[in-house]
């Protein structure tokens, strides 16, 4: 029996490099991932816009979700509302990818291009590609979404956007889903697949009404337009080529980490992986390609729809956050529920995603609050928890432990250096940073692109 040799880390790495024919540490980390770290609506669009303009981003890519998510970007003297389009579409130097992990509603795609004035720009079609492997959202999916939500008791409703996102992902897993590639291939075969899909759902929900011929005629027009503009392609291969050429890729996560299908407040979650793993599977890059992971965090907490929200406020402070913060959903138009920032959940979010930096947004909304609280721990039945409950019913019995801060009662809008923020404001930021052990690099103090403090590059 051979002897066991103890190797140092350097010796082990050298050994593996020889066996693997390369370096473990020199991988081409040209992919950055930007994720919502809470329940969505954190202000991702603004940070994405800043990164594109200031960090030479060559490609932006959507990796999951559909037109159920919403980004708002204020730039070029106007406000843009994005649901399925990557935010880089407003930059003439940026290429945009809708990845295989996205579920694509083509009606919404073309409407969004028109709504945001993209169709009026010369050459826009040369800067965007839809993955041929992405699944299509049909009107029947939206109807099923509504029927499923209606069938739930009031206390069990998920708060879906009724955009058909969940049923489309269900079709994908059930393996009767229809992909963009199917639409672009033999149309008769596509039509037959579509008819079978409709029949499948009508057996479950007989009240569904679908004019199959009208729908197919519409998709034939979509097919012709996609082909004419050459908007569909192999996005995995394209991104691989861009990475090999040293181009910088920014992946835009939709929704938020606390809505992840696995790690969120299940079942009150979205239907895809909105954590960092979804970025890899949603555009087809290996984990070794990812360098920076930026978590976007609102300086307080919001949520749309139903589901656990331990720090939710039902008093004048909650109303004040909603009013000053203009907390209305971009996609649904529903008022967002508001509360104090939950650092216990945020630390869990950081644990799962490995954030290398945090972007703290809407700090200015707290400028006039005399007292500000942050959640730092949970108790359940008198027991201190080390992690959030995995069982849905347990959330209702959570006791929240808070740390209280005295407000700074000074305006922060217009501040561009961290040291120029009020001292009490800096203390608030530093406490968050120390608690989750991730540097806060970007701080939003207003809606405009320029209303941003950058602490380090």
From Swiss-Prot:
Q: How is the cofactor bound?
A: Binds 1 Mg(2+) ion per subunit.
Q: Which GO terms describe its cellular component?
A: cytoplasm
| GO biological processes | 'de novo' AMP biosynthetic process; IMP metabolic process
Q: Which InterPro entries match?
A: Adenylosuccin_syn_GTP-bd, Adenylosuccin_syn_Lys_AS, Adenylosuccinate_synth_dom1, Adenylosuccinate_synth_dom2, Adenylosuccinate_synth_dom3, Adenylosuccinate_synthetase, P-loop_NTPase
Q: Where does substrate bind?
A: 330-336
Q: Which cofactor does it need?
A: Mg(2+)
What pathway does the UniProt record associate with this protein?
Purine metabolism; AMP biosynthesis via de novo pathway; AMP from IMP: step 1/2
SUPFAM superfamilies assigned to the protein according to its UniProt record, in alphabetical order: P-loop containing nucleoside triphosphate hydrolases
Asked if Magnesium is a keyword of the record, the answer is yes
Entry's EC annotation: 6.3.4.4
Which residues does Mg(2+) bind? 41, 70
Source species, domain of life = Eukaryota
**Enzymatic class:** ligase
Active site: which residues?
41, 71
Which positions in this protein are listed as binding GTP? 40-46, 70-72, 336, 362-364, 444-446
GO MF entry, a single one: adenylosuccinate synthase activity
Which reactions is this enzyme annotated as catalysing? IMP + L-aspartate + GTP = N(6)-(1,2-dicarboxyethyl)-AMP + GDP + phosphate + 2 H(+)
Which family does the UniProt entry place this protein in?
Belongs to the adenylosuccinate synthetase family.
Function, as annotated: Plays an important role in the de novo pathway and in the salvage pathway of purine nucleotide biosynthesis. Catalyzes the first committed step in the biosynthesis of AMP from IMP.
Instruction: Summarize the subunit comment.
Output: Homodimer.
| Name the UniProt record assigns to this protein | Adenylosuccinate synthetase
| Organism from which the protein derives | Caenorhabditis elegans
Gene that this sequence comes from: adss-1
């Amino acid at each position: 029996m051979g002897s066991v040799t103890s190797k140092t880390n350097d010796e082990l790495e050298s050994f593996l490099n020889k066996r693997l024919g390369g370096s473990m540490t020199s991988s081409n980390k040209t992919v950055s991932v930007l994720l919502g770290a809470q329940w969505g609506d954190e202000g991702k669009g603004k940070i994405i816009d800043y990164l594109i303009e200031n960090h030479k981003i060559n490609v932006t890519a959507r990796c999951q979700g559909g037109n159920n998510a919403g980004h708002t970007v204020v730039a070029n003297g106007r406000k843009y509302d994005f649901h399925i389009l990557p935010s880089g579409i407003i930059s003439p130097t940026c290429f945009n990818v809708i990845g295989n992990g996205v579920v694509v509603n083509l009606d919404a795609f073309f409407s969004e291009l028109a709504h945001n004035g993209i169709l009026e720009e010369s050459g826009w079609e040369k800067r965007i590609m839809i993955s041929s492997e992405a699944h299509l959202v049909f009107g029947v999916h939206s109807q099923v979404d509504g029927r499923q939500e209606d069938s739930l008791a009031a206390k069990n409703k998920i708060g879906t956007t009724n955009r058909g996102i969940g049923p489309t992902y269900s079709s994908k897993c059930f393996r009767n889903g229809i992909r963009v590639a199917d639409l672009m291939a033999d149309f008769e075969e596509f039509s037959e697949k579509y008819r079978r899909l409709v029949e499948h759902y009508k057996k479950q929900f007989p009240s569904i009404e679908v004019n199959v011929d009208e729908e197919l005629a519409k998709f034939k027009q979509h097919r012709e337009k996609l082909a004419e503009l050459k908007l569909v392609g192999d996005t995995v291969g394209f991104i691989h080529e861009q990475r090999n050429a040293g181009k910088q890729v920014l992946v835009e996560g939709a929704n938020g980490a606390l809505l992840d299908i696995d790690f969120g407040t299940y079942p009150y979650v979205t239907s895809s992986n909105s954590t960092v793993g979804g970025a890899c599977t949603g555009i087809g890059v290996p984990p070794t390609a990812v360098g920076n992971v930026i978590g976007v965090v609102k300086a307080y907490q919001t949520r749309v729809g139903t589901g656990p929200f331990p720090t939710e406020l039902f008093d004048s402070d909650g109303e004040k956050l909603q009013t000053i913060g203009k907390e209305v959903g971009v996609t649904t138009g529903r008022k967002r529920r508001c509360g104090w920032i939950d650092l216990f959940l945020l630390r869990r979010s950081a644990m799962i995603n490995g954030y290398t930096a945090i972007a703290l947004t809407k700090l200015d909304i707290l400028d006039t609050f005399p007292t500000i609280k942050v959640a730092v721990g949970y108790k359940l039945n008198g027991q201190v928890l080390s992690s959030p409950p995995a069982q849905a019913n347990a959330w209702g019995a959570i006791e929240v432990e808070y740390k209280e801060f005295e407000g700074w009662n000074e305006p922060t809008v217009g501040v561009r250096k961290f040291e120029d923020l009020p001292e009490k404001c800096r203390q608030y930021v530093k406490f968050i940073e120390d608690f989750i052990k991730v540097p806060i690099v970007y701080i939003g103090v207003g809606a405009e692109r320029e209303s941003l403090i950058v602490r380090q590059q």
